[in-house]
């Protein structure tokens, strides 16, 4: 893929602060239309990488291409950044705060009002737009922060823990907004510790540990790569005893069968299909969760000295 087709191209980044090496060797690419997961434990170097992408820090080694080349002042207006440390003007109304920050990003006043009204409606904030930001709940402030990050229609969106403080209803509202941005062609980098959100939303990820890229690819490919020889069977009736099944677990009508190397999934399906009074509703590979993979990959490298996030 060419540089122009990538929103971000990071190659062999390294960054130290005194004797502490925060980033050792990080490489990845983010495409337009991606929701890309930037993952890693606390202290892995994720925030330092984000700050290098945004040109807040300069790398000691390696290269970064942002929207087709080096970062410029003009490109900064094409980027939306939601940091983990939130920042809003708290002593003014929600509407005034959103419009002010939109105009700082070059959005004309009338256009900013139109976009703000659309977001207020979409995120159930219309009834609260005259309130001071400081009078809103944490979850509502989070939604306002999301609006200020999106209102200038960025080509690149970098969001750090976007679902922090949100209940399930508001989490779904924010998910819908982010998917809408993805469908518009926006490149989205999402840093989060919520692995179920990664499975639901991200198509590609990089896992950073101790400042290095240790896992990189599509979510589907990575889950298949770490899959055990196991299947998930949903069936009505009792499963028969089958030679070569070394471990089983059950939740309701769903059974996970871990097989020995000598048993293939095709052979297992044949045996189950021949079992009397067993109605199979689904039969599929049992893929590990991203949470399982995160713990496995990061756990393989512990213990060690901590890095700096």
Predicted region positions:
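ABC-family P-loop ATPase nucleotide-binding domain
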Residues: 1-14, 300-309
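ABC transporter nucleotide-binding domain
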Residues: 175-260
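Structural motif detector for alpha-helix initiation sites
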Residues: 32, 94, 219, 287-290
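Residues at or immediately preceding the N-termini of alpha-helices
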Residues: 72, 109, 219, 262-265
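Active-site phosphate/pyrophosphate- and oxyanion-stabilizing loops and adjacent acidic/basic residues
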Residues: 99, 196, 220, 270, ...
């Amino acid at each position: 893929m060419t540089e122009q087709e990538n929103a971000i191209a990071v190659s062999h980044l390294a960054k130290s602060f005194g004797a502490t090496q925060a980033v050792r060797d990080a490489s990845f690419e983010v495409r337009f239309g991606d929701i890309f997961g930037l993952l890693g434990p606390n202290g892995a170097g994720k925030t330092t990488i984000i700050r290098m992408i945004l040109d807040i820090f300069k790398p000691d080694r390696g290269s970064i291409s942002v929207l087709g080349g080096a970062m410029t002042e003009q490109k900064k207006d094409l980027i939306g950044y939601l940091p983990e440390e939130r920042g809003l003007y708290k002593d003014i109304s929600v509407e005034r705060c959103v419009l002010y920050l939109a105009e700082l990003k070059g959005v004309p006043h009338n256009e900013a009002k139109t976009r703000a009204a659309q977001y207020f409606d979409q995120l159930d904030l219309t009834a609260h737009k005259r309130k001071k930001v400081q009078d809103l709940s944490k979850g509502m402030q989070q939604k306002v922060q999301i609006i200020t990050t999106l209102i200038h229609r960025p080509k690149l969106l970098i969001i750090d823990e976007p679902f922090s403080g949100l209940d399930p209803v508001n989490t779904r509202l924010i998910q819908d907004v982010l998917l809408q941005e993805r469908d518009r062609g926006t490149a989205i980098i999402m840093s989060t510790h919520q692995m179920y959100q990664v499975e639901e939303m991200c198509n590609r990820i990089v896992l950073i540990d101790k400042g290095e890229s240790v896992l990189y690819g599509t979510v589907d490919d990575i889950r298949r790569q770490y899959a055990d020889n196991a299947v998930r069977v949903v069936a009505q009736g009792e499963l028969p005893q089958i030679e070569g099944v070394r471990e089983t677990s059950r939740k309701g009508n769903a059974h996970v069968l871990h097989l020995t190397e000598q048993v293939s999934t095709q052979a297992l399906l044949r045996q189950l299909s021949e079992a009397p009074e067993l109605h199979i509703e689904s039969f599929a590979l049992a893929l590990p969760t991203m949470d399982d993979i995160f713990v496995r990959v990061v756990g393989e490298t512990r213990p060690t000295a901590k890095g700096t996030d």
